[in-house]
A protein has these predicted regions:
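Non-catalytic structural connector segments
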Residues: 158-198
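Peptidoglycan glycan-strand catalytic modules in the bacterial/periplasmic cell-wall system
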Residues: 1-158
Length: 198
């Protein structure tokens, strides 16, 4: 398959962090925010839940400080892996493995370049670029093609592979299957999932 982590890392760093990222938070900060919220919900700590979601400078500073410590302790690949395991990849889909199973009926480790690019593109705006929503498919394909261009620029695929992949209609690549989704299927993280959804 494709180096999914490499593709996701290149996309996240080039497109989300350096590009038109919303909210001003780094990937590590977004991950920290989600982990803090998840932990507060697991602990049934309403005060910690409030502090994990409050829209204040204090919360941002707290996230930045924890992010700095995380970046000292963990590699970028480990942080990315953690983020990808809890990030949203479409309507009620969390984690890259679930997305790979849902959209393409394969494990994330077995994604090809087109599939990996499609999933990477969804992270920009999971509801807007969900490829299963017919009204989204044109925009989703445009985003996928931007990721394919980045993959070629970063050397993950050749220019020829990029051109062929971009000429492949998005709908022709989908092999949709039902997966366990929703808060009841998130195991220990059901409360976190429910909070995020509602």
């Amino acid at each position: 398959g494709v180096d999914v982590q490499g593709v996701m890392r290149a996309f996240v760093q080039t497109y989300l962090v350096k590009g038109s990222q919303q909210g001003g938070s780094s990937l590590t900060q977004q991950y920290v925010k989600n982990v803090l919220l998840m932990q507060a919900i697991e602990d049934n700590d309403s005060i910690a839940q409030y502090h994990a979601t409050e829209d204040t400078v204090a919360r941002k500073i707290r996230e930045m400080l924890i992010s700095v410590q995380m970046e000292k302790k963990y590699t970028k690949a480990e942080i990315l892996q953690g983020y990808l395991n809890i990030a949203q990849f479409g309507s009620n889909l969390y984690g890259v493995e679930t997305a790979a199973q849902r959209y393409f009926s394969v494990s994330a480790a077995d994604l090809n370049a087109v599939q990996a690019a499609t999933i990477a593109a969804i992270t920009k705006n999971p509801n807007k670029y969900d490829p299963l929503i017919e009204a989204n498919q044109e925009e989703s394909q445009k985003q996928r093609n931007l990721v394919l261009d980045l993959m070629a620029q970063e050397g993950y695929i050749s220019e020829k592979e990029c051109t062929e992949a971009k000429n492949t209609p998005l709908k022709d690549t989908l092999k949709v299957q039902d997966v366990n989704v929703g808060c009841q299927d998130t195991g220990d993280y059901a409360f976190f999932c429910d909070y995020v959804v509602h």
